[in-house]
Curated annotation (Swiss-Prot):
Expressed predominantly in thymus and brain. Expression is down-regulated in 28 of 95 tested cancer cell lines. The modification Omega-N-methylarginine is found at R1245. This is Probable helicase with zinc finger domain. May act as a helicase that plays a role in RNA metabolism in multiple tissues and organs within the developing embryo. PROSITE patterns: ZF_C3H1. A motif (DEAA box) lies at residues 794-797. Residues 1117-1141, 1246-1345, 1386-1429, 1527-1552, 1608-1637, 1729-1779, 1792-1843, 1870-1942 are annotated as: Disordered. ATP binds at G668, P669, Y670, G671, T672, G673, K674, T675. It is found in: Nucleus. It comes from Homo sapiens (Human).
């Protein structure tokens, strides 16, 4: 029995402790320890060593608790040292495991509580409590971690944990791929993480690996569940799967079927205005002849709880018999009714809907009569008010425009007189001018990783300049046209009230502010805080004719006052006289705000004043000692209200100056008494001799508080030495200052202004109180450093470090510096994303907090909060303050609402046009309703209900306006509604949080941030998702509340998106535990999260566009040329049934783009015609996942189980044909075509791809890709902001500034036979992606073939899976060239139009049928006959210079510079990408380039026509694949065989005319180029001044950062063209361990690969740099899903097998080079082609695996590797260098028009209409960017000599690099001279051979020198021009990517 004694004693000790019998507990502990002592020798009867260790630790902990309670502190401390020493010596993990075990059994709580109480009370007899504090921290960390694990979210994890032994924290929710888990950069680098256990990134490689394992194990479980389910699949799932797999989906499900008439009541789309609503629909189905109804079922899962079948009756029109329907019925099975020979039969079906929350709900009902198609009907209900917020419309009265800044070059500026700027201020403004060149800003210090002692000044100077440019840019967005009321005087009410009178001929002007300029918007905040002058331009009644050479006058006016509603201006005498202004009249003026540069100049000045920055980088190697004595601790003069921690702080501050201390940090959240503590310390310091105190605060109100509440009463009590001097800003209006404070200020005798202090004034006072801004006055008084002995900075966390150091210029090493603040509150706002990345916004307090070790004595946390309820404190303590806070105040709670309460609203967040903000109407109504309810139930204990009682906080201005408006309607205007930024320092009895964001627009990152590059906090993502990702924002908001925090939001989104999801998990779990989770159950949240993560067949897209077979689509587009449109503004997206469910419920999209948040232009496809029957084969199931925001596509049964594939949801309105990524294995299923697979929309963040089931992860081939595209697309579409090419005045809005509106010519497109190719219409409707956002880059799509069906034969180390190849004969040469010549010489001349950007999308369909011609007879609706053969022969080879899919341009006329008769350059209609039939759609997202699948729609042969006839019925919709499948004999380009080069073969590429810098210009064009160019603020491109007058709104231009993004994404990764592929073209040659032979043998001998010959397809045809030689990690080569049709061969195109009797797709043989020589023109870029190969199809094509390097918001450009880019300006595969030269010569001969005979018929589609001019580089998308290999080639790879020669020839002959710079491209990474040489020399030496001319960093710093235009303008020195040169992104406008180049 003895071996159980110790354990028993330990248990008894625990019981005694809980009973508070401490002496007995002590006794039992001692017994247990003594018992354990005897087991120290090897005793086989005793417990095992681990058990001994556990009992020992437990007993010691109980002993410590008992000793503390018995006040035996010394013994407790000794035991504590013992437990820590032993526990940690044996490994911290083991020790923590014991603690976790105790916590799970509930044994840790009593110990932890006692420890916390002991340490937060009085100091333990003055002893040092370092060990006890450390133990307490360990215990609280353990409790936090364990409680998170137990919070209910990870029940399944705990289950797994018990069996699989998981050791780390549970992973974050909402992850849809194990690749999304990341490592926490901050933790790895600094060993601490602000998020603690709540961090969504792993804190070690081991934790990361475990998370990935857990994810995999959950996926396996899901797969098993699916396999089990498959045996007994439900009717609904079977039906959906059948529909998905059907060749003719409309034959499976349809909205109308023959012989059944459907009537419904009410409308299918209903809006209800109350939250608690009930709705029923009755469907009457009249069957003639009579038929049996077998089933009625509801299909859509996500909203199932809200819908049910309530009644079914059957009979004739007069008598109905009710059928039995179970309760909450989801599927009713009938078939038992007798029809008694009736000729007709009527069924009535009742569907009920119930909701108690606001939101949008959808359902699909199917009625199965035993025949197909099955009838379906879709219903939608919107539980939200749809009233327009009229006042918001009213707010649009202020016309906000973007225009050129007014400066002395464009206007005559009349300065305001008298000018009150002091000489010192003038000198500062002059001294700190923004440097004029980039290399002065981008110094090494800015590019350094962090702030150091050595780079301190230079780095902060540069970042301040960069921030100034960003502020300037933000403020430049506003020209306001306003009615200015002229006043002679005005009155202000309130505390700061008083009257002001104009004197000396001056007048006041007043104008009203609207939401546009309130503190709630970014720019508004800037205007309210950083602007003190405006330029004013009178708007004349009639437009005056301006004479040449005269400049308009603008007048400077100063801002006199800013109130919440008005701004008051002071107008100068000269202005009033010249404009003849009179009081009490109105005049219309245009205003431009002028940034006040002075505060930034003062920060520069402060930086230069800091002589010794050692104070700012304290040495922490030696721990300082703060002397302690009982006399000091219990000094009677200390205020008795001070708690222990506050006393500790006072002791540290008042430590004798002889003892040097680093800056003392007093950390504490609001409500812990920081100001009180500092004030007590001041009183104490004044008792020491020779001390002088400087108190600095961030705000005037806080400074006044010291005087009013502390110093004034102290002076009045008889302490004259404490008399403070309050220094105020000299222009502050005296009347606005509190009377008590007046007596401590220096006020001029006239009592009108404050005076600047003189040195004597300072010497007279021992206490000086200033704000950080006014502290600079003291610096100007020549006070010697060290004059103040103590410098106390309050609110130190709210100021940037540059502001905080102003007063520190007066400090020395001996000065006692104290910083008080809350490091977890919001940091100051910085407008420049670049500066934010480099931590310009971080406060000194924040930086030192991280610099000091955890238990540093100068880092004191005040931990008793007196303001909030205990539940609120405990939550914030646990999550934000390491468990150290405790509630000391007694705040009453509400009887009905627990202090943490959650109200569910399932709305959708929307972004308005011209707004960077979001709103969510469902939340607006929920908040208002709950506010009303709370007011009715206001407890007496909460006191009077007044203005400060209820606060509503949200991160977005738009939501603020909407909630205010709704409250106003309910007469609840006393409720405070604010943005979080504006509530710091305020407090409310009740606080409502509206979180706004949902998965509707927040797409979770689909790719990992590069490991170890986890986003840094305060990155763009934080700003972007508000409460979902910025923990400081969340903490700031929650800590405002005293008794109740009520959150209104979408719980699924909160728990699955953003870096705060674990904080929200905990919040919702607490609400659940306390029964305060309303509107959804905890179980539902868990189920939906699991469904979301594991991609069950849970949700399908309710907004799914209707399926129209391709053939019908073509007919329809022929019958209408209506534009696709978005829902009207101000109207609910789901307002009518038409909007939602009919394919022509269409409204015109508004082309305006967001101000400050540009998004991409997007062109919808043509709508379908007016034949409802033909066009109506709508999607039967709602296919949007409400949680991920993605659409979901069922995968056919070959996968086993109802696996679902996520596909992007491009547009949430009707009539838009969906673009879905389809797995190639279901290409055989017509359902794929139902989704218009060839028009595949790029994936975005929101489309998780379930490659987990044995498919390739997103990094399969590792290609960067536009991750943000779909997000933008989604936002844009959702708001109807689609940029369509509207003719008329709106056309201007979608052009870049230099594009003037053109009148599109009406062209008879049908007259060109090529235009009638089946794909020419749908193929061009690609959304442009040239408006990037700030998301991470994603790996690009690569068309990866499916792996072998037998995983066991998978070949390791193989980058690309082998493919079968069959030889295939070449085609005869088509006779199309004459026609082409005719077309290509047909460019219309358009003056005034500069080459268009690839930012928009070609809108060919809209014109395709404008002048219809009688079509020739067709083979099938999908394949038109006749001259269309040209289409089948169209070229499809690698097209090096074609822009990516998204880069196609809306119809625009060709540039003016290329006159019709003289230019060899031709516009090319973009045969739009038929987006990749992704060979594995489980690969990643966003193929931004010309997709590989494009091949499928353009290689068609004459042989194909015959096959088409045979296959017509089956393959009507397969236009792009048919020719392949039927063995059309399009030739493939072959490998290098010089003897075959002469063969005339049809082209396989669309020839792209290269951009030439020296285009032949017409006279008018030349004039235009002569004009000097200035930069335009949001554009990187330049435009001439004459064009600027007509620019569109700045907000609508592509943001500067777009260049950087495309720089990574869009540059082609192949090196320049080579004469013919050298030996390195062998695709296996990249991998050292493979050669062709080995591969052949290996594959050929493998029974699993019967037909697999060496595939020459996937590897790029050039040598890879050495770093890319490694094979990919094994995880990227996961085996694919098994192919289940054993008797069918698996073929790469049709998926594993193709059952339709078509032969397998042949591949090109590896021999025979293929070079086209036709009309003296060599084919461009004949790279080896395979329709599914990943050709270098666009400039964004093929980086190698290693180059996959997405950039997160926190990932600056210069940290990324240089990737290759392509220059294929002239000819890629020319037979000889001479040919190359000849061809390039032709390029330079501008009059030689005949030399450009393009051989691709497709290339001239629609020539005479305005077509894209493809080679114009814009925003980084140029094809002509110089290859990185030429600039800085990888050292290890030397291309073969012939390749180098060819590269050089090409580049040198035809490519002038300056055009890139001139047109807004990136600078070369070598000096211009060198480029010129390489561009004009014809020496065989390639630049690739040389060393890199310039490092990347130096390229960043080097000022790029553009090719000067004929007359180079003098560089403008104003900040805006400079901004455009640097094109830095500002946080709101550019959202985060900036280019560092010109």
């Amino acid at each position: 029995m003895e071996d159980r004694r110790a354990e028993k004693s330990c248990e008894q000790a625990c019981e005694s402790l809980k009973r508070q019998d401490y002496e007995m507990a002590l006794k039992h502990c001692t017994e247990a320890l003594l018992s354990l002592g005897q087991y120290s020798m090897a005793d086989f009867t005793g417990p095992c060593p681990l058990e001994i260790e556990r009992i020992k630790i437990e007993s010691l902990l109980y002993r410590i608790a008992s000793f503390l309670q018995l006040k035996n502190y010394v013994q407790a401390d000794e035991d504590c040292r013992h437990v820590l020493g032993e526990g940690l010596a044996k490994g911290e993990d083991a020790f923590r495991a014991v603690l976790c075990c105790m916590q799970l059994k509930g044994k840790l709580q009593p110990v932890s509580t006692i420890l916390a109480k002991s340490l937060t009370g009085e100091s333990l007899n003055g002893m040092v409590t370092k060990d006890l504090t450390r133990l307490k921290t360990l215990l609280s960390e353990t409790e936090t971690a364990t409680s998170n694990a137990l919070s209910g979210y990870h029940v399944e994890d705990l289950d797994e944990g018990s069996c699989n032994g998981w050791h780390f924290r549970p992973p974050p929710r909402g992850i849809t791929s194990s690749e999304e888990y990341t490592l926490c950069k901050r933790f790895l680098e600094q060993g601490i993480c602000r998020y603690g256990a709540q961090c969504t990134s792993a804190h070690s490689q081991e934790e990361l690996a475990e998370w990935q394992k857990r994810y995999a194990s959950r996926l396996i479980k899901l797969k098993q569940q699916n396999e089990n389910k498959q045996l007994s699949g439900s009717y609904m799932e079977t039906l959906i799967e059948k529909w998905m797999n059907s060749l003719s989906p409309e034959k499976v499900l349809s909205e109308c079927i023959e012989g059944v008439k459907v009537e419904h009541n009410p409308d299918l789309s209903v809006t209800v205005s109350t939250k608690k609503s009930h709705q029923t629909w009755t469907f009457a189905l009249t069957c003639k002849p009579a038929r049996m109804l077998y089933r009625v079922a509801l299909l859509y899962d996500a909203h199932r709880p809200h819908f049910s079948i309530i009644a079914i009756s059957a009979g004739d029109s007069t008598t109905q018999v009710s059928q039995e329907v179970p309760e909450n019925c989801q599927e009713w099975i009938g078939g038992k009714m007798a029809q008694n020979g009736l000729d007709h039969y009527v069924y009535k079906v009742g569907i009920a809907f119930n909701t108690e929350i606001f939101g949008t709900f959808r359902q699909t009902i199917v009625f199965d009569f035993g025949l197909e198609p099955v009838l379906m009907q879709r219903v939608m209900i919107d539980a939200a008010s749809t009233e327009d917020l009229e006042y918001l419309m009213h707010a649009k009265q202020q016309l906000v425009t973007t225009a050129k800044r007014w400066d002395s070059s464009s206007k005559t500026i009349i300065d305001f007189e008298p000018n009150e700027t002091t000489d010192l201020e003038k000198s500062l403004l002059i001294r700190y001018q923004i440097p004029l060149s980039a290399d002065q800003l981008f110094t090494q210090s800015v590019l350094d990783k962090s702030l150091t002692k050595s780079n301190y000044q230079s780095r902060l100077h540069d970042l301040l300049y960069i921030e100034e440019i960003a502020q300037y840019k933000e403020i430049s967005k506003f020209n306001l046209k306003v009615q200015l009321q002229i006043l002679a005087s005005f009155m202000l009410t309130g505390v700061s009230g008083g009257a002001k009178y104009a004197q000396n001929g001056q007048l006041f002007g007043r104008f009203k502010l609207t939401e546009t300029l309130s503190e709630d918007t970014l720019a508004g905040r800037l205007v309210m805080t950083k602007v003190n002058a405006v330029y004013l331009l009178p708007v004349p009644k009639q437009k005056l004719v301006q004479t040449q050479g005269t400049k308009e006058k603008v007048y400077e006016a100063t801002i006199e006052e800013k109130t919440k509603e008005y701004i008051f201006l002071r107008l100068s005498r000269e202005c009033c006289e010249e404009l003849n202004l009179r009081p009490d009249c109105d005049t219309q003026v245009e205003l431009q705000f002028q940034l006040n540069r002075l505060p930034l100049c003062e920060m520069h000045y402060a930086l230069d004043r800091i002589k010794d920055n050692g104070v700012l980088f304290p040495d922490i190697s030696m721990t300082p000692t703060i002397p302690w004595s009982p006399n000091r601790q219990w000094d009677e003069q200390l205020d008795p209200r001070l708690n222990a921690k506050q006393k500790e702080a006072v002791l540290a501050i008042t430590t004798p100056l002889a003892i040097q201390l680093p800056p003392v940090l007093i950390i504490g959240p609001y409500g812990t008494g920081k100001t009180f503590t500092l004030a007590q310390a001041v009183k104490h310091i004044l008792q020491q001799q020779e001390t002088r105190i400087l108190i600095c605060t961030h705000s005037n109100s806080a400074a006044d508080l010291y005087i009013k509440d502390y110093l004034h009463p102290y002076v009045e009590a008889g302490n004259p030495q404490a008399r403070p001097l309050r220094v105020y800003f000299r222009n502050r209006w005296v009347k606005t200052v509190h009377p008590v404070v007046h007596q401590y200020c220096l006020i001029s005798s006239a009592h009108s202004t404050f005076q600047m202090p003189q040195k004597e004034d300072i010497l007279k006072h021992r206490v000086v109180v200033v704000t950080l801004n006014t502290s600079q006055y003291l610096c100007q008084l020549d006070l010697e450093p060290g004059f103040f002995t103590h410098i106390l900075l309050d609110e130190a966390a709210q100021a940037m470090e540059c502001e905080t150091i102003m007063p520190l210029a007066l400090a020395t090493q001996n000065t006692r510096i104290v910083l008080a603040g809350d490091h977890m509150q919001l940091s100051p706002f910085v407008y420049s994303e670049f500066a934010r990345e480099r931590n310009l916004h971080v406060s000194l307090l924040d930086r030192l907090y991280e610099h000091y070790p955890a238990e540093f004595p100068c880092r004191i946390l005040l931990c008793e909060n007196y303001r909030s309820h205990e539940a609120i404190i405990n939550y914030t303590s646990e999550l934000f303050y390491e468990g150290k806070l405790m509630a000391s105040g007694k705040q009453p709670a509400h009887k009905d609402f627990y202090p943490l309460t959650f109200f569910t609203a399932r709305g959708e967040d929307v972004q308005e046009k011209n707004s960077t903000a979001f709103y969510n109407n469902a939340e607006v109504f929920e908040v208002v309703e709950r506010v009303e309810e709370l007011r009715r139930k206001w407890p007496v204990a909460w006191g009077k209900l007044d203005d400060g009682s209820i606060g509503v906080v949200t991160p977005y201005a738009d939501q603020v306006f909407r909630i205010r408006a709704e409250l106003r309607k309910k007469r609840l205007s006393d409720v405070n509604v604010e943005r979080v930024l504006n509530v710091q320092g305020k407090q409310f009895r009740v606080l409502f949080l509206s979180t706004v964001r949902t998965r509707h627009t927040c797409k979770h990152k689909q790719t990992p941030i590069k490991k170890k590059e986890q986003l840094l906090e305060d990155s763009t993502e934080d700003l972007d998702y508000g409460f979902l990702s910025n923990y400081k924002l969340l903490n700031t908001a929650i800590t405002r509340a005293q008794s109740l925090v009520a959150v209104v939001g979408d719980p699924i989104a909160l728990c699955s998106i953003g870096r705060c999801r674990k904080f929200w998990e905990r919040f919702i779990a607490l609400c659940h535990e306390n029964s305060s989770l309303h509107g959804i159950t905890f179980e539902q949240i868990k189920a939906q999260l699991e469904a979301l993560e594991l991609k069950k067949t849970y949700v399908l897209n309710p907004l799914a566009p209707e399926f129209i077979p391709r053939a019908l689509r073509l007919q329809h587009s022929g019958s209408t040329n209506k534009q696709q449109q978005s829902p009207p503004k101000g109207k609910s997206l789901h307002h009518t049934q038409n909007d939602h469910f009919q394919n022509d419920g269409i409204v015109q999209p508004n082309p305006s783009v967001l101000i400050g948040n540009p998004i991409r232009a997007y062109t919808p496809p043509p709508p379908l015609g007016p034949h409802p029957n033909l066009g109506k084969s709508p999607s039967p199931v709602q296919r949007i996942d409400p949680h991920t925001g993605t659409s979901i596509l069922y995968v056919p049964a070959v996968y086993g189980g109802n696996v679902v594939m996520s596909v992007p949801l491009p547009v949430p309105w009707t009539g838009y044909q969906g673009r879905f990524a389809v797995d190639p294995r279901i290409i055989t299923h017509q359902a794929a075509m139902a989704y218009n697979m060839n028009l595949l929309q790029t994936h975005g963040r929101g489309s998780p791809i379930p490659y987990g089931l044995g498919h390739h992860p997103p990094v399969t081939i590792g290609q960067p890709q536009n991750q943000h595209q779909e997000k933008d697309q989604h936002e844009q579409n959702r708001n109807g902001k689609s940029d369509t090419n509207n003719s008329g005045p709106e056309i201007n809005k979608i052009r870049t500034p230099e594009k003037k509106p053109t009148e599109p010519k009406q062209v008879d497109l049908e007259s060109n036979p090529q235009n009638r190719s089946p794909e020419s219409r749908p193929s061009v409707v690609y959304p442009s992606t040239k408006f990037p956002r700030k998301d991470n880059l994603n790996p690009r799509h690569i068309n990866l073939p499916l792996p072998a069906p037998h995983a066991q034969y998978a070949i390791p180390n193989r980058h690309f899976h082998p493919l079968p190849q069959l030889p295939r004969p070449p085609f005869p040469i088509p006779q199309q060239h004459t026609l082409l010549n005719q077309q290509q010489n047909n460019l219309p001349e358009q003056p005034n139009q500069i080459p268009p950007q690839p930012n928009q999308v070609v809108q060919q369909q809209s014109q395709l049928n404008q002048q219809p011609q009688q079509p020739p007879p067709q083979l099938s609706p999908a394949y038109q006959a006749g001259p269309n053969n040209a289409f089948f022969n169209s070229a499809v080879a690698h097209r090096p210079q074609s822009p990516p899919a998204e880069a196609v341009i809306p119809e625009q006329q060709p540039p003016p510079m290329l006159q019709e008769g003289h230019s060899p350059l031709r516009a090319i209609a973009q045969p739009g990408p038929i987006l990749p039939s992704h060979l594995n759609s489980f690969i990643d997202e966003n193929p931004s380039g010309l997709p590989i699948g494009e091949a499928l729609d353009r290689i068609h042969g004459s042989v194909a026509l015959e096959t088409l006839r045979q296959q017509q019925a089956r393959f009507q919709q397969w236009s792009e694949h048919h020719a392949f499948l039927s063995q059309g004999s399009a030739p493939y380009p072959h490998h290098h065989h010089p003897h075959l080069q002469h063969l005339p073969q049809p082209p396989l590429g669309l020839h792209q005319p290269p951009v030439r810098a020296d285009w032949k210009l017409t006279s008018s064009a030349e004039d235009e180029v002569e004009t000097t160019y200035s930069r335009f603020q949001d554009l990187i491109r330049e435009l001439s001044h004459r064009d600027q007058s007509e620019t569109r709104e700045l907000a609508e231009m592509p943001p500067p950062q777009s260049r950087l993004l495309q720089y990574r994404q869009v540059q082609s990764r192949s090196p320049p063209a080579v004469p013919s592929p050298p030996s390195s073209t062998d695709h296996s040659s990249h991998f050292s361990n493979f050669n062709d032979n080995s591969r052949d043998i290996e594959v050929a001998s493998n029974p699993a690969f019967p037909q697999r010959l060496p595939p020459q397809i996937f590897n790029s045809p050039f040598s890879l740099p050495s770093e890319h030689l490694a094979p990919p990690p094994l995880k990227y080569l996961a085996p694919d899903g098994a192919w289940t049709f054993a008797n069918l061969q698996q073929n790469h195109l049709m998926g594993p097998g193709f059952p339709y009797g078509l032969p397998p797709l042949p591949h090109r043989p590896p021999q025979n080079p293929f070079v086209q020589i036709q009309n003296h023109q060599h084919a461009i870029g004949q790279e080896p082609f395979h329709p599914l190969s990943s050709r270098t199809v666009s400039s964004s094509s093929l980086p190698s695996l290693e180059e996959y390097e997405p950039r997160g918001p926190g990932r600056p450009l210069y940290q990324r590797r240089i990737s290759s880019s392509s220059v294929q300006p002239c000819s890629e595969e020319v037979s000889t260098p001479q040919d190359s030269l000849a061809q390039c010569k032709e390029l330079q001969d501008h009059s030689n028009q005949s030399s450009f005979n393009f051989s691709s018929p497709e290339s001239w589609v629609n020539t005479t209409s305005s077509t894209p001019y493809q080679n114009i580089p814009c925003n980084g998308s140029s094809r002509t960017a110089q290859p990185r290999e030429l600039i800085a080639p990888p050292k290890t790879v030397k291309p073969p000599e012939d390749q180098l020669k060819s590269e050089n020839l090409e580049v040198s002959s035809s490519f002038n690099y300056s055009v890139l710079q001139h047109l807004g491209q990136f600078p070369p990474l070598m000096p211009n001279k060198q480029i010129a040489e390489s561009a004009n020399s014809s020496s065989p030496q390639s630049s690739a051979g040389g060393k890199p001319a310039m490092s990347y960093a130096s390229a960043l710093r080097a000022p790029p020198k553009p090719r000067p235009p004929p007359e180079q303008a003098k560089k403008s020195s104003d900040p805006l021009s400079l901004f455009q040169e640097l094109s830095l992104g500002s946080s709101s406008g550019s959202n985060g990517f900036y280019s560092y180049f010109k």
